């Protein structure tokens, strides 16, 4: 019973207790009257006769006792149940006459229930509490066991976790070395780095070099070695620590970073603490001081700028190498005072008091908190716009601070090259000025720089001398502007700027013979090309030497035409070309030689050059003889001189139908010309660059191309040149050359680049034969500068030089005397009396050789020199017109006294049968009334045809033209309009030297008119020859 009292009270137990009482009542010898209350009205087998509901009692069976159950909560006692209690166990448990609670209340309902039993009648009406106070720490054995187990498990988990954390921290430090994310000093290797073992007691401060914001710099002596000592006060201790730590970063040694020796601290005589940084001594001092005392040439200036850039690029580079790691470093105070100059002319970067180590988006700078401001530091004059505005990109600190350094580097570039002597040719170099010194003076304020740099977006001004169109100067200006760009993201990186500075030095190396600045009308590409063939003959003759950069103003006046020439090459060789040398500027050379033999325009006579040029090639290339004939007033005033009669097997005259207009000129589209006029010098420079690298140089010694100008067919010769005697009444003779010595002309491919000459095409006879230029005879070629051709109207009449060339054989890798004889004449005479039967078979063989293949066709897709004009300088028209007037008079009147007609009208006319044997058909022009008129110079380089009779014969149209005569201009450059090589006429080349009218002859005349002076050039057994066309017959014989 005792154990049951100690157990927690539950309602089912009470029911079982009542059941037990009821079941054992029968065993009791005495009936007991007890108080009764049962709210649940459970039927426990008690008869209704025993329960008295009026007074709430029950008559218990014998052996039963009374019990009561109360609930005590919040000071109130509520009766739960009363009745008879029949128990099994010790009867002494309920031997009390009163209902006394002697046991501790059970834990049911937090100990609020009270139970008692007694053995007298109605003893259970009330109850009495009589039990000891409960224990303050009563713990049941199961609960104590669970608590101890929880404590043990928690302690073990914490211990294991602590061990893991310690192991991870140790492993992280071992793997990353001195790296740490954050702003605090954590570099284990750096902290463990040993200072150089130097005794600072031997350090002596000799003289003060300079003083800055954070200390003074002295020249000192350490162990009898000159050193520079930077002294910091106690107030600037943080700058000392930071600069010392930057110098001690692993892999910090570099040629363009100041060499650090040792850093230490000491007490002064008055007890103050000072900090010393001992560094290598640089006698030239800072870059600012050096530039104020010295000027430099282009190479030295590039060396200064390149070395600073190289040092900054190394600072900005993150460099892991083995066990060492160098983070990227931002200087943050880069200016010309913090750059030192070494004895070899290179620079080193110093003063790292404000520098930061950069690790991604975080910074490493000892002594600063995470929210430390990284803006508004450094020298105000060199602050970038974003720093002045307080708009540094804190999300990408690494890139932002590098861009700040690049802005300052651009200002240093400007300071360095403002003292470059090569950039100020012909004038004194300006005194040294710091950046923005002209705008804000020597002591600018923060607000001044904000207004100037951030709001007004101004930068230091480039001088007028830097406005020249030079590749070097232009690249320099672009580099500087890309460094100090207003947009920080658009600035160059230090590595890119280093490459650009190296390229500037390479440009100078390639252009040693010229200054980096050139004349305005010259392009950098012309400088490059002029260097490859700078051997020029001296200027000879009455006319100035026009270089490739010359251009011609558009003019319709006769003698008021203005020719501007600004040479991009200031130095010329004083040694003339001799035999055996290859002159690449052949057109210019020919013109100079011709001018040298002309005393004046008024007394021009025919002269023959005796100087020849030879070409050494590595392959078998055709060799052609070349000579120059200038204008001849008249045969009776002077005579033709010839030397070295050609050695030929059997000279044979050749008779061919003289034709003109096998070539057709593609006229320029005015829209295309306008487009060319609008092109800037930048596009011209790019065009020249692309042209240079798009194909091989046609003038190189290894090129197999033979290039022919359109007006003067000038080619180069190998070996000794011979000339035949040409006099009045003597025909032009062509020597017989053995077929074994004839080699086909090389094939000239149509390279995909800008053509350098006019194309070939045959005009349809149904089309209009000429292009109308209008009343003022203006050319459709407009003025174009630098790289675009210009053509003026040409009104003055003048006989043009005719070059007669013949191919010989050039041996491999050595010179061979050519067997080809070349005879040249201008409006010369050809005698009659040549045998027609010899002409027939000789001309037939020549025409067959022309149709062999493409390799035998001469290509005129390019000229011998892309720098030189297509036309020679025109002679003054005063005396020449008089000469041509006499020529016209002689053409119009019959022969007198057997004298040969100067225009070959009656010189050995060939029979029609001879002409048909060559496959060439001629149609005689109907005679018409002859009207004497004055010959005039053509308005443009026009080779269009008037009438086409068949595939091999073309009649030359002629019409009258009115206009004033005047001196013409020459074409200095090719027009950029693309030409196409449409079709070859393999039978003949016809290049007219007689001007054709600017208006179309549409007067309905049946007479086929001819040019008074034309030249037909044709191939004959691998050679070339020229002759003139007759006005009456339209053909002539050689």
Curated annotation (Swiss-Prot):
Its cofactor is Mg(2+); Mn(2+). Residues 203-504 form the Protein kinase domain. Residues 27-150 are extracellular. Residues 593-626, 746-769, 872-974 are annotated as: Disordered. It is a single-pass type I membrane protein. Its main location: membrane. It is found in: Cell membrane. The modification Phosphothreonine is found at residue 379. Residues 909-924, 937-964 have a biased composition (Polar residues). One of its GO terms (cellular component) is nucleoplasm. The keyword Chloroplast does not apply. Disulfide bonds join 34-66, 60-84, 94-117, 99-116, 118-123. Residues 603-626 have a biased composition (Low complexity). ATP binds at residues 209-217, 230, 280-282, 337-338, 351. Residues 872-896 have a biased composition (Basic and acidic residues). Residues 1-26 form the signal peptide. The chain crosses the membrane at residues 151-171. Residues 172-1038 are cytoplasmic. Glycans are attached at residues 55, 110, 126. It is an enzyme of class 2 (transferase). On ligand binding, forms a receptor complex consisting of two type II and two type I transmembrane serine/threonine kinases. Type II receptors phosphorylate and activate type I receptors which autophosphorylate, then bind and activate SMAD transcriptional regulators. Can also mediate signaling through the activation of the p38MAPK cascade. Binds to BMP7, BMP2 and, less efficiently, BMP4. Binding is weak but enhanced by the presence of type I receptors for BMPs. Mediates induction of adipogenesis by GDF6. Promotes signaling also by binding to activin A/INHBA. Interacts with GDF5. Interacts with BMP4. Interacts with SCUBE3. Interacts with TSC22D1/TSC-22. Interacts with activin A/INHBA. PANTHER family: BONE MORPHOGENETIC PROTEIN RECEPTOR TYPE-2 (PTHR23255:SF63), TRANSFORMING GROWTH FACTOR-BETA RECEPTOR TYPE I AND II (PTHR23255). Belongs to the protein kinase superfamily. TKL Ser/Thr protein kinase family. TGFB receptor subfamily. This is Bone morphogenetic protein receptor type-2. It comes from Mus musculus (Mouse). The gene is Bmpr2.
